[in-house]
Amino acid sequence: MSFTNTLRKLVHRKSWEYLAPLPLVNANGSFLVSDKNNLTPNSIIFYISNAASIFRYDGDEDSWLQLPTSGIAGAFGLGACGEFRGLGALGGVFEQVATGGGLDTINTNRTIVRNLAGRRIRVTSGLGIGFDSTIVSNTIGTNAIITVSGGTTFDATTRFQIFSGSMWFQNAGASAGFAVYDIATNTWTAKTAVGITWGTEGYLIATPSSITPFASGTVTAGAATTLTDSTRGWLTNQWANSQVRITAGTGIGQIRTISSNTATVLTVSSAWTINPDATSEYSIEANDDYFYLLGNNAVTLYRYSVTSNTWTTLSPGSVRSGAPGAGCSGAFIDSASTWVLNSDGSPNLLTATGAGVYKQNGRYILSFRGGNTNALDMYDIALNTWISSIEYGNRNEAFSTTANSVDYKGDIYIMKEATGRINKFSVDDWAHKSFTFNPIPAGVNISGVKLAILPYEEGGESFAYLYSMYHTRQDFLRMLII
């Protein structure tokens, strides 16, 4: 069944729908995290009421289910935050190691407790590298065996990823912990903590690859640590810290972090197992390995590597000119519709402020500074630098304690403290705009992300719902975004 979205602004009025209420009244630090990119077929929102009370909302059913307690270190409260990833984190990692296999079967040492049929699986190294399809079936319980179709053989050298979903959680307080909940195994795994007392406000920001590639092409030459496309005209280092994937031909399936680039050559951070050549095709994507953590009323920005389970305190070329305080935000911009590259792969200039800002999806984290200011700062992932206090349309209103936000396809939806107003920052229009009003009376004003997005896609058409909880209440609502 297909549909055509004929809803139009002004003609059709946005309207809230009441949903099944939150299982518990929210409190300081309580937050929502959702599969806003529809990477798993479940329409999931996670409600982290506190470190011990965590719930899953199924949009398809309008119902809640309690999940296992996190066991995370720290003291839940101001600054607690999280992020959803489409990749499963079985055992706390994205890349899984097969223990054996055969024709269309992969043996694992994981205890998978649910049916993963229909979930995407891709092989990243070893026997079967380049395989990218869906799971046909799996056994339940210890040492689960995964079955696929297509006639590919796997063995103990096979490394693979499953798009079964995971939720990453940064706690607050002294000795604040960091942990991940994996859906396939229904298990929490403690990860390396950032190692500081965390509070005030916080945003954990992922850079997932599986939205839309930012660029693609055919290789004209390859070497141990390089990939050349002589048809390109990239800006120097515009793709640094993104990842490149070989999608066809020699070396298919390999993924590497891009350490630098010239106009026509990508240099990767570690040598190829098989050098790409003129038969190879590639795509440039967001880097699956990284999370960024900002907030804590400090200019310091942290980056977490899933592969190494380590945190890096970044040293930007230009430091952020003001600390992100109460009411700050953080959004990875990867799908602005008007940020289209030129035919040679180079981006267009948005503003010459600082090091220059380019209309390039996947390059920037946008962050309203909060702290009762209206400053908008941008972190340039490629150049590891901040561009501070950038001008934008309708700049006036300040964001303060309990303002919070969620981003979706180039728009940032911002709850304006406990005013009831939800505004929108449009990347395409580069302007702060009004959007809607939540009529529910606020209880005690509290911190934490209270907005989430769930999209619906079918037959090439799509639309999305904005979900909202409010201050110290159990009410839960949604609105169709028009």
Where are these regions (language model features)?
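Short loop/turn segments that connect beta-strands within beta-propeller blades
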Residues: 58-62, 182-186, 305-309, 380-384, ...
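Autoprocessing Asn-cyclization modules and mimics
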Residues: 88-159, 163, 181, 191-196, ...
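Short acidic/polar mixed-charge low-complexity motifs
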Residues: 53, 63, 127-131, 187, ...
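Enriched but not universal
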Residues: 1-17, 21, 470-482
